């Protein structure tokens, strides 16, 4: 908890020095995506264009939501598969507990879990749960997930010089091309 305490102390110093408040919301309570500038980097521009084609609320996700991230400590491949599957099955409960999105444009969202609605309609290739992507049990989860992500169209990649460029090539296609050229390390 020492690291957490240091992080919180640093955060509170910035908040205090800048007369800010911490709000525990999963979605910006007052503004829509058209009110918030997109981060001015090519990868975000490419993601934005992709999400406008592959979901209805990608702009909202990129500009108005916060993320919930969980780290696990694992001891084995089986441990990882079991924990990942159980955590994914518990995702709806976690979304309900931590999404905290009671307002949109300053008005009550009622019983709607707005943050979860946004993420469910962001990008069907990359979002949702494992079962939505035909991974229905923990047995062989890692291999089945790898098989799945090898078929997902890319958004951007690093070219030979390390620059971000757009792509719709899948990771599987990219790896085959690199192997064919003898460039796969």
Per-region residue spans from a language model:
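Membrane helical hairpin/interfacial module
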Residues: 1-12, 17
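Loop-rich catalytic cores of soluble enzymes, especially ATP-dependent carboxylate-amine ligases
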Residues: 13-17, 21-185
């Amino acid at each position: 908890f020492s690291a957490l305490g240091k992080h919180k102390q640093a955060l509170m110093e910035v908040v205090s020095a800048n007369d800010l408040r911490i709000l525990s919301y999963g979605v910006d309570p007052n503004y829509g995506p058209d009110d918030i500038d997109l981060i001015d980097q090519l990868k975000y521009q490419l993601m934005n264009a992709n999400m406008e084609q592959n979901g209805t609320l990608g702009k909202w996700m990129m500009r108005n939501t916060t993320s919930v991230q969980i780290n696990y400590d694992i001891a084995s491949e089986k441990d990882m598969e079991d924990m990942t599957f159980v955590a994914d099955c518990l995702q709806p409960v976690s979304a309900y507990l931590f999404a905290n999105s009671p307002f949109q444009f300053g008005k009550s969202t009622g019983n709607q879990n707005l943050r979860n609605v946004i993420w469910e309609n962001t990008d069907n290739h990359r979002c949702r749960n494992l079962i939505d992507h035909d991974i229905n049990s923990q047995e062989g989860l890692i291999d089945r997930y790898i098989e799945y992500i090898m078929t997902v169209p890319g958004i951007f990649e690093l070219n030979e010089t390390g620059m971000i460029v757009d792509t719709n090539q899948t990771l599987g296609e990219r790896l085959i091309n690199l192997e064919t050229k003898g460039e796969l390390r």
